[in-house]
Amino acid sequence: LKIKPLYIYLFYILAILLSLYSMLSAPMPFTVNPFMHILVVFFAYLLSFLLIFLLSLLVSDVLKLIFRLKRKTHLSILISLTTLLFLYTTINAFCIREKETQIQLPHLTKEIKAVQLSDIHLGHFRGENHLRKIVNKVNELNPDIIFITGDLVESHYNSDKQTIAPLKNLKAPIYFVDGNHDAQVGVEKLKNNLREIGVRVLENEFVDTLGLRIIGLEYMRPNKQTSDPLSVAERKTIQSIMPTIPVLDTMPTIVLHHTPLGSEYVSKAGADLYLCGHTHGGQIFPLTLINDKNFVYNRGLYKKGRLQIYVSQGSGTFGIPLRLGTNPEISLLILQSSL
């Protein structure tokens, strides 16, 4: 099968741009510089456009083969598809939807309306105004409790006190656990800033509220066999920490952790609900298909014996500001008694 030279050129260009973008967008203090910010945004959208162009080229070439399209028609389809897809994916990346899910829990004495926020990724593409919009949307839902399951920030740019300040306007108690990107930026500083505005940061501990036991885990590996250089505490694993935190049979237990890994240890401990994020649902088709293979729990609600697992697609994006085949979400979880 002969590959068109254009595809080869595009792959080379994308590889070079991806390398440059990875260096420019690395979570280093110098990226706070306004000039660096402009460079990061420019390369991100250039990379995004070329990815969409490559996908559109592939689709239009397949259509050309099937329907024997003339060159002019083929070119028109390519231009139209590239334009529409680029506009849709870049706009969709910032259009946050409320996704409601009903979850049955044992020993629950009353219905609880919970909101889960995950993977907001404050940084070069999202700042204080974006977070304020999320806060307003959450307040409109009138939740009883709010969980933030990591990756609140992704860059030194837009990760200061002022940027996260809108969170103090949330009208329900907030519980936070950190993610891998929080660790890259400086997790202790972020945690202290959150505490100052009234957010309860959970570090391998529990709190009882609303008839629920909430366990919050730091970002960590599921077990010692798993390698992860970004793990906050190298000696800690979900396998080693979960047995040290009491789980009661008389009230529902919810465990917060950034990634859906380690669910077997959460299940073994006797927890009822595991709230996670990290995956973004794959974020961009066809990466969504790869993510479905890489993560047993990629997006939405799953059941593993007694344990239910909810994986949020996140409210932001990782890397480039595109969403295709997934939607940024605010997860509205209606917790109801299973009895």
State each model region's role.
Residues 1-94:
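Non-catalytic terminal accessory segments
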Residues 104-339:
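Soluble catalytic domains of enzymes that build or remodel membrane lipids, polysaccharides, and related
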Residues 32-40, 65-118, 123-140, 159:
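N-terminal signal-anchor transmembrane helix
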